[in-house]
Amino acid sequence: MWKVWLLFDPRRTLVALFTFLFVLALLIHFILLSTDRFNWMQGAPTAPAQTS
């Protein structure tokens, strides 16, 4: 396993990994925000009150 770090620079590899994970997290959150069920910013749509 230690020979892998001889091929790749650890600093650049970790920066690339964390950048990829951050972009992936943003993408997942924006996809969830675009749905009605998981949009926590606007809240669930409320049903109109029924009077009888």
Swiss-Prot record:
Residues reported to bind a bacteriochlorophyll: H29
GO cellular component: organelle inner membrane; plasma membrane; plasma membrane light-harvesting complex
Keyword Cell inner membrane: yes
Periplasmic topology ranges: 34-52
Chief location category: membrane
A matching Pfam family: LHC
Protein name, as recorded: Light-harvesting protein B-880 alpha chain
